[in-house]
Each structure stands twice: as C-alpha cells, then as structure tokens.
C-alpha cells in the first residue's frame, strides 16, 4: 500500500497571555492508503488541532505535510481549493456543524455546486439522493432541516456532505462523542463500510479508547501536544 499522508515535525503554537501554547509540538507520522489512524488523548492534548492543521483549517507554525507525495505545506488558494476535493472533515458536533437554514438536500448538494460537479439540476438531485442512500438517509428526509432530525441522522448528513466530492482522505473529529451509545455503533459501522467501499483513509480523533480500538488500524497517543506513542 502507498503512503497517502506524511506529516513531518508539525507544530502549531498559539499566543496566550501566559506565553506560547504548544498545541501540536513536533509531531511526525504517516498513513497508508485505505487505513485508519486513530488519534487518542485527553481533552486539550492537541488531537483536534492536529486534524485541523493537516486540513489547513488552521495554519501550521512549522513543519511539512505531504499528500500523495506532494508537499502541501503552504498551498496557494487555487491549490487549496483543489485539495478540498480530496481532503474532507466530519465534525464532532452534528448540531452546530450544519447550516440550520439549509435542507438536507441543500447541505449535501452544496459541495457539488461549489465544484460544478453536476451539469444539471436533475443530475444534482440524483447525486444527492444517491449520497443519502449511501449514508442511510431515506429520501423522505431530503427536504427536512437539521433541527427536525436526531443526532444520528444529523451526523449522517455530515458524513454525506464529506463524501459528496469523492475524497480520498477524511479527518473524523470525535464524530460519535455527541451521540447516544446505541447510535455510536451504527455510525462507526457505517464509516467502516464506507471506508471499505470507497477505499477511504481516515484520521479518527477520539478520547474514547473503546472507539479507537474498534475502528483503527494504527493508534497514536497524544499528550500535551506531543505524540507519546504509536502502535499498529
């Protein structure tokens, strides 16, 4: 298997009134295509920040990021737009990560519109229905709004939105921590099925050891911004 993501000496520091906060401090790792790297640690250890820096949702202080062998450490705007097609994120809170003014179909269809993937409204509608079916959302919900659905279905919307552009790589930031235990297993199994079907590569961020054991091929432990252990 080929290496899809390589991170070298990545740092992310924040200025605070007490000096520099080393949220991510000299972290290095690589992920092979089709595998899941579980990143586990207590709250505040820097694991979510790491995922956001890898996706350029936050700028790195220092370090190198390679995606499919290409250095993407400081991408220009056009390159970053291109990277968004292949690098996506599923957020922790399905309650706040979705636009409350958009319907399910509009949320999932928005990336397709931004990237001009579909040539007609009919093609767009068909693609949205296909994605909804893939993530286990019945067609009857396409005109529903996020507040009308439970947490599990909201997270399925977030997963569908992330899948819309057929990415290669997804950062999953505590995607089941806000859900009931009974729903957590359903979402985890869905994500594993999607990974097998589409050969997706995940960084799976969590504080729950049982979750990371269930879904991960490799596990990285973080503490105070530092990688303290990595196992396969």
State where each predicted segment sits:
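P-loop NTP-binding/switch modules centered on Walker-like glycine-rich loops
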Residues: 42, 179, 183-232
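Helix-to-loop junction immediately C-terminal to a conserved catalytic motif
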Residues: 55
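Conserved ABC transporter NBD signature motif
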Residues: 63-71, 83
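Conserved ABC ATPase "signature" region
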Residues: 71, 116, 122-140
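Conserved ABC ATPase signature
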Residues: 145-149, 153
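A short, proline-enriched helix->beta-strand linker immediately N-terminal to the Walker B motif
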Residues: 164-168
